[in-house]
Amino acid sequence: MAKLHRLISAVLRLAAAGAAAAAAVIMVTSHETTSLFGIEMEAKYSYTPSFVFFVVAFAVTFAYSLLAAVLVRPGTTASRLVLLSDVTVGMLLTGAVAATGAISQVGKSGNEHAGWLPICAQVQAYCGHVMGALIAGFVSLLLYFLIIMYSLHAVAEPLCSCH
């Protein structure tokens, strides 16, 4: 049973690492230059602080997921510390996806009340990259939710006499 726990944990963590790496790489490669009324406009992820936060959060998640997949053995005392770290990473990912999603919505739809115009009609490839990064980010976040639920089960299972 311990080998099965370790295998499931490793597979979930490696999948989360892959999704996190994809999210970071897709966001980093989001770049487009266009001309609007003779004025050159450049859209790049590094111009938006929430997108930079997104890249850093998912890069950290990638590294942590790989380390945890290799080093963590479910059911050990250390797995409880890793569970705490998993929850922290889950909160980090939630913040990154939420911040990026909010800014993306403004980029797509603008904000009439603030006088902000939408930009996605002018830089469609850029906005497509950002959307792809968000999708990969949501997948990674969902996998971290599953990791947390599975880790809670693995930690609580030896404590429960109900089996």
Curated annotation (Swiss-Prot):
GO CC terms, sorted: plasma membrane
GO terms for biological process, alphabetical: multicellular organism growth; response to auxin; response to brassinosteroid; unidimensional cell growth
Extracellular side, ranges: 29-50, 102-129
Transmembrane stretches, start-end: 8-28, 51-71, 81-101, 130-150
Subcellular location as annotated: Cell membrane
Entry keyword Cell membrane: yes
Intervals, Cytoplasmic compartment: 1-7, 72-80, 151-163
Keyword Membrane tagged: yes
InterPro entries per record: CASP/CASPL (IPR006459), CASP_dom (IPR006702), CASPL (IPR044173)
Keywords, in A-Z order: Cell membrane, Membrane, Transmembrane, Transmembrane helix
Topology relative to the membrane: Multi-pass membrane protein
Record note on quaternary structure: Homodimer and heterodimers.
Family: Belongs to the Casparian strip membrane proteins (CASP) family.
Protein name according to UniProt: CASP-like protein 1C2
Organism: Zea mays (Maize)
